[in-house]
Amino acid sequence: MSTKKGGPKAASGKGQALLPGSKLRATAGKPRESRQLQRKASHPSKGSFSENPQAPAAPTAEDKAAIVIQCAFRQYLARRELARRCQERQEYLDEMEKLQKEAYLALVRQEQEAARRQREKEEAEERARREELQRRRRLLEAAFEGDLGEIRQVLKEVEQLMTREGVGYDEDGKARRLQRRVATVECEDSHGNTPLSEAAAGGQTMAIQLLAELGANPNTKGAFGRTPLYRAAFGGHLEAVEELLKIGADPRMYADDGSTPEQVASLAAVASVLQSWDLSLTEAMLKNMEAEQQRRAQEAQKHKENEAKRINIKVQQLAKEQQKCQKELQQAYCELNRRIMEHDKCERKFMGNTELTLQAIKDAEAQVDRLQQEAQKAEETLAMARLELREQTPEDEDTEPGLKCRVTELHDVLMKDVGDRIRADGRWPLVIDPSGQAATFLRYQDTNYVDTLNPEHLRPERIRLALLGALRYGKPLVFDLRQVNLFPVVQQQLEVVQTGLAQALLNRGLLAKEGYLSLLRPTDGPEYDPSQFQEARLEN
């Protein structure tokens, strides 16, 4: 019934016109009626085409109120979104400022800590130097005065110091202690006088005997080229002269003025003893002393070799630890790159869970920072051990190979090879630049750049194409090792591309007899046809 009544009213146009919104509201609850209206509206009468369309009615108060409410609500949403974005920006700025302050404070604390360690090291060295000078002064004074207890006390302090330094009592430890003891009893004052010379000048026979037993040389020259025997004879100390002659003092040695101990003897008895002394005994004792010195030199050399061997083993162990740290750091870098790629993928595909990926990136960055510190510490420890090894074997030290140049000169040195240094050397250049400017320079040159910390760059196919492109177009192939020693990883990836490729690339065997053609694949395309490789480009 309702559909029949509603139809004519809608078609005749005599009833009150409805707004589109009100019409929808009127027909929303009656689907059959709405469909009937649509059918009848789609088949109007012939007379309706000639009639003028009726103008829409003005919006009602309800419509106006709805529009006002919608505008106000949208303004509220916009203000709230603006406030949220402003708050996020302010939080971001505050966080960046906080991080900058923390980084600055961390840098200041790091510099302060380094300065404190350096200051403590310098203070310890200065304190050790003062203590050494004090022991030397005490030993010289005790020798002149004949204070045997003080001499033994000084030597005991030296033994205790070596014990604190970790010197043991094994064969090497005993050799080091003997060297230190001999060096102590043969110390010199500002004039070059030794404790034995001071004891001779003071006429202290017992001190002379004790110092000789400890390994002191009786024929050293001090101020004005005077020997201990010269000073004892000049002072008229007969017993001291006799004791010095017994331990091997040579009465034939001259001072700087050309005088001998016999000539400056202040007592006739002293001159008589020196004149009547059998020089054959002196010759025999000199031979014995020379043999003893040779034995000590051999022991010192043996100890030096053992010490160098020990340090070499230590360096090898530290090198293994450093390589382990570098490998862990490389894995951490790869993990960080994977996390970044996962985050970018989530953002591109609107997959959500970006908070989780960001947290994973933060965790990976923290892991990288920790491993960087460990790797840096291992590198510093290894460098100090290598320095100690070089100090132990200075004769094996060679001049540093290579050529030092500024970054502004890299284009002439690497790209143009001015002077044909690289061509004459026959090896591929290795650029070492702690500042990283050389890597930036090479990255923006016309090179095939491979970042060894990027797993995508280390894919075998990418390395193969980079190498082929370098040979085909005469472009440099650059492996950027960054701050990590990844050369073994590069070699491993080259071996994955082709067995023996790393060695063939290093010794230039890849260029001989067109060996590079083995890298070609059927899918490479016509630009990599064997005829496209030119000899002039291969030589570069």
Curated annotation (Swiss-Prot):
ANK repeats lie at residues 191-220, 224-253. Keywords: ANK repeat, Coiled coil, Repeat. The keyword Repeat applies. Residues 62-91 form the IQ domain. The keyword Metal-binding does not apply. SUPFAM superfamilies: Ankyrin repeat. Residues 281-388 form a coiled coil. Residues 1-62 are annotated as: Disordered. It comes from the Eukaryota. Residues 1-17 have a biased composition (Low complexity). This is IQ motif and ankyrin repeat domain-containing protein 1. It comes from Mus musculus (Mouse). The gene is Iqank1.
